[in-house]
Amino acid sequence: MLDIFEKAGWPLNPDHNSGDPMGMAPVINSAQGGVRSTANDLLTPRPENLTIVTNAAVQRLIVEGTKVLGVETKGTRYFASKEVVLSAGSLNSPSILMHSGIGPAGQLEKFNIPVIRDIPAVGQNLRDHMFVPIAYQRKETSTSRPLFYGNAQAMEEALKQWQKDGTGDWSKYSSELGIGWMKLEGLESSPEFKSLPQDEQNYLLKETIPHYEVVTHFPVHYFLPEVPATTHYSCFLVFYYNAQSRGEVTLQSSDPGVPLQFNPRFLETAFDRHVAIRSLREVIELTKTEAFAKDTVGSLAAPNSDSDEDLLAYWQQYISSSWHMTGTLKMGKPGDVDAVVDNDLKFMGFDGLRIADMSVVPVLPSAHVQAVAYVTGATCAEKLIREYNLL
């Protein structure tokens, strides 16, 4: 597949971790021995000073005045010896605060939640990467995946092999992807670009800042479950980066178990629509090249044409969040009306509470956010270690 991109004139990149992400390459994985290892690295071997309580989702904070004392789950209260560190993510951390009476007063009062502190910025400033899939049926010689996913016996045998030693088809198919970041040539000449603030224009013109991302070999059944498992296909994801719109998450119930309403405001600005249309068109042009088209049988999911109207309509029909949400509890300086967390990750206006997840990150990186989330957690740990002399 990467040969097809190269023949079409797309650049290749031998190292996406070099500081320059531009170009296509095999995706970098955080797996070892057939297991996604990074997330549980600190749990192996099991730390003696750590207790994990399962099936105990936090519903609200225990607050006395301006002091956060602990957390409350359904039927149980847990009190902190030093601080509460909230790490529930960009959607759930604001939810816990709001159900604790900390957030936009109008929303809290609407659902009869007593207001402890009116903080309008809680749940605002949401940023996220959006994407759409496009998929094509391919000749049998183009991919081996249906020989696996379309064969129940092969999958069962592969599962036994993976359970035994972490090897085999189950350890590779879900992580064998191509990925790349690209710029749109001549974007700076468009009226949509010229209407942006100068600082934003300067940022987007930097050589290492992409306008969109492409992922290859994505499982089509995530979007089109009706496609037979024996179908030979190629599925691409087209991500739009550096969107100008800002969304929000808001209360829709007094029940802590009901998720916040998620409104990313995708494609709200003219610039966002312009970049979304052009990025999708560039990937579709790749599929028309001889190197790719010679093995194409037909389309499984694609726009009706490459007109601006059809491309935008396709985005509007199939658009998805990438679960890269940031900014709903934004970090900033005291006095910043959009900020609720300081540079020590402390929730401003309260003692005993820090936030350590992607909700505090004030920008949306031009990358997948896994590493950023890990760095945020590690930074919080370092600050706690220094402040309380934990080592």
Language model: regions and residue ranges:
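Structural core of flavin- and non-heme-iron oxidoreductases
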Residues: 1-391
